[in-house]
Amino acid sequence: MILIDGKKIAAELREQLRQEVVELKAKHNKIPGLTVILIGEMAPSQIYVRMKEKAANEVGLKSEVIRYPEAVEEKTVLDKIEELNKDESISGILVQLPLPKHIDKQKVIETILPGKDVDGFHPMNVGNLSSGYESSVPCTPLGCYLMIKKIEPNLSGKKAVMIGRSNLNGKPMAQLLLKENCTVTITHSKTKDLKAECLEADIIVAAVGIPELVKADWVKKDAIVIDVGINKTENGIVGDVAFEEVSKVARALTPVPGGVGPMTIACLLKNTIECFKRSQK
């Protein structure tokens, strides 16, 4: 079995991006800029933002974090986004989720200029992805897609099963695989026989938040299995796939942690650079 090493693939991608930033600076005499807005003191969000900032600096992006207290008014955040929209030195804007309850997530997402939406969550970018137009793609599915392509460059005709239908993972992942001429099935909590669906699949992407849901007898021999889940259990962090047993049947499998996570951050940097390039056309 091939262990899909997200850390290694992400490091390779970051090196490519670092070289690209050098070339862009030489060509345009400026570099892409990423601004992250962080609200409140949630520990996981603080950690994610630190990792994003470190990675951005590593590839040579201009990086800034704007921090607000938990009680910040929604208007303050929206006004700041409007200000960043107008700032030509900022290529990408990201508001770290989740947000406090008094702030409307959708309103925040829709205030970010689609051309600066590095998360790919703006309805216009969601529409662009499903219509086949160029725009930002959500970072986690993009990372999963790049890992799958690393293992199997020719995906045409493959059967792919998505477990989970979220706007964040399931739906955009399905669109990316459809573009590659996969036959895609999106499954979810109401799917009648999930195991039977999975047994048909050449590619399984599990993003449903149920610890070790996907067992060895759900996976056909030589399938590629991507585990997006991060679940805290008594035995530590586990994914949505029972790693030990599935590793005995799968052709390739991502670990948790160290699989999808590093690629998500690398793809955020990729999206920022792509936003910059589109803005220079």
UniProtKB/Swiss-Prot annotation:
Keywords: Amino-acid biosynthesis, Histidine biosynthesis, Hydrolase, Methionine biosynthesis, Multifunctional enzyme, NADP, One-carbon metabolism, Oxidoreductase, Purine biosynthesis
Catalysed transformations (reactions): (6R)-5,10-methylene-5,6,7,8-tetrahydrofolate + NADP(+) = (6R)-5,10-methenyltetrahydrofolate + NADPH; (6R)-5,10-methenyltetrahydrofolate + H2O = (6R)-10-formyltetrahydrofolate + H(+)
Known pathway: One-carbon metabolism; tetrahydrofolate interconversion
Keyword NADP: yes
Binding site for NADP(+): G164, R165, S166, S189, I230
Keyword Transport listed: no
InterPro entries the record matches: Aminoacid_DH-like_N_sf, NAD(P)-bd_dom_sf, THF_DH/CycHdrlase, THF_DH/CycHdrlase_cat_dom, THF_DH/CycHdrlase_CS, THF_DH/CycHdrlase_NAD-bd_dom
Gene Ontology molecular function terms on file: methenyltetrahydrofolate cyclohydrolase activity; methylenetetrahydrofolate dehydrogenase (NADP+) activity
Protein family: Belongs to the tetrahydrofolate dehydrogenase/cyclohydrolase family.
Self-association and partners: Homodimer.
Role played: Catalyzes the oxidation of 5,10-methylenetetrahydrofolate to 5,10-methenyltetrahydrofolate and then the hydrolysis of 5,10-methenyltetrahydrofolate to 10-formyltetrahydrofolate.
Protein name per Swiss-Prot or TrEMBL: Bifunctional protein FolD
Natural source organism: Pelagibacter ubique (strain HTCC1062)
